[in-house]
């Protein structure tokens, strides 16, 4: 279970006493998630999620994340809404960790999304980008192209233990992407981690977007490229162009891509794949003793990179004029 900080009953009761969310009926740890400690709270008023932020989330970034969720929820986006305590603040402390209570969202994530899920996700992503346009805070993307070489430096010496010639392939990718990375594309608030486990569905409709703790200010099309990587590859490693076409078309129905974004899509998709390969690779090589959470396989994204290197245009992802 992904519960890194144990919370005694007495400490939890004292923390909840500062909130107008009713009396606690039950609570349990949530196994999903690898970054933070999460609990499901059931009270006499309703259901909530309690999150304790572990070391990987910088406390100084929390006002951005929490402010963004409040902003998006106020504009009708289905996302967790931070609950403020009686003092009027959303951010508290519990067991030495920054802690927040947010609203509970109904729905389930899908492990193997179909075309209809990809279409709904494209529509929801465009809605997120539109809702965040007037959000006043900014947060640079700490895991964009400038961060990839320092990340690789942490793993380069051991990379070929994970897969033959992985280090050489990664050096080539870095050189190409650093040279050609697109700048000044249309941008604003992006989610930057909208994998299938961060999207809830009821039927074929998106019922909620969660886990905004990589959200930042960057190119909108990069967020779309992350989603193409996360949603449109099959288990055999092939890219499903039908899913890509559904996602891109639904996104474009709300926010048409401009010609620069279309031209840049292959590089953005390759860069997105490299970003997740590198963070997974570093985690894979640095599993702490006794870890309860298995790190994600970096080679899944090494295989996706092999596809992106061959792509010559956005049409291969399903974009149509």
Swiss-Prot record:
It holds the Pfam family APH. The keyword Glycoprotein does not apply. Pathway: Amino-acid biosynthesis; L-threonine biosynthesis; L-threonine from L-aspartate: step 4/5. One of its GO terms (biological process) is threonine biosynthetic process. It is an enzyme of class 2 (transferase). Its EC number is 2.7.1.39. It catalyses: L-homoserine + ATP = O-phospho-L-homoserine + ADP + H(+). Keywords: Amino-acid biosynthesis, ATP-binding, Kinase, Nucleotide-binding, Threonine biosynthesis, Transferase. One of its GO terms (molecular function) is ATP binding. Belongs to the pseudomonas-type ThrB family. PANTHER family: AMINOGLYCOSIDE PHOSPHOTRANSFERASE DOMAIN-CONTAINING PROTEIN, AMINOGLYCOSIDE PHOSPHOTRANSFERASE DOMAIN-CONTAINING PROTEIN-RELATED. This is Homoserine kinase. It comes from Methylobacterium sp. (strain 4-46). The lineage of its organism: Bacteria, Pseudomonadati, Pseudomonadota, Alphaproteobacteria, Hyphomicrobiales.
């Amino acid at each position: 279970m992904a519960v890194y900080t144990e919370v005694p009953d007495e400490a939890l009761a004292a923390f909840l006493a500062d909130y107008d969310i009713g009396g606690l009926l039950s609570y349990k740890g949530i196994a999903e998630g690898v970054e933070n400690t999460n609990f499901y709270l059931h009270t006499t008023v309703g259901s909530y999620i309690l999150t304790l932020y572990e070391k990987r989330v910088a406390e100084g970034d929390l006002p951005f994340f929490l402010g963004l969720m409040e902003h998006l929820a106020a504009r009708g986006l289905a996302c967790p809404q931070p609950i403020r305590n009686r003092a009027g603040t959303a951010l508290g402390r519990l067991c030495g960790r920054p802690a927040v209570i947010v609203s509970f969202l109904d729905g389930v994530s899908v492990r193997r999304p179909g075309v209809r899920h990809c279409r709904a996700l494209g529509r929801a992503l465009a809605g997120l980008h539109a809702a965040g346009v007037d959000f006043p805070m900014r947060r640079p993307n700490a895991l964009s192209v400038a961060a990839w070489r320092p990340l690789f430096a942490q793993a380069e010496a051991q990379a070929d233990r994970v897969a033959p010639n992985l280090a050489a392939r990664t050096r080539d990718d870095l050189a190409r992407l650093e040279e050609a990375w697109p700048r000044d594309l249309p941008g604003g608030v992006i989610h930057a981690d909208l994998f299938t486990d961060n999207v809830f569905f009821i039927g074929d409709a998106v019922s909620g977007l969660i886990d905004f703790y990589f959200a930042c200010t960057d190119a909108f099309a990069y967020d779309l490229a992350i989603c193409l990587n996360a949603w449109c590859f099959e288990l055999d490693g092939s890219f499903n162009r039908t899913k890509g076409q559904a996602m891109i078309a639904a996104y474009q129905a709300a926010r048409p891509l401009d010609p620069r974004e279309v031209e840049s899509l292959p590089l953005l998709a390759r860069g997105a794949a490299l970003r997740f390969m590198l963070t997974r690779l570093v985690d894979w090589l640095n599993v702490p003793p006794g870890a309860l959470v298995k790190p994600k396989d970096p080679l899944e994204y090494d295989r996706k990179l092999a596809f992106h290197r061959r792509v010559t245009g956005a049409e291969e992802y399903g974009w149509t004029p």
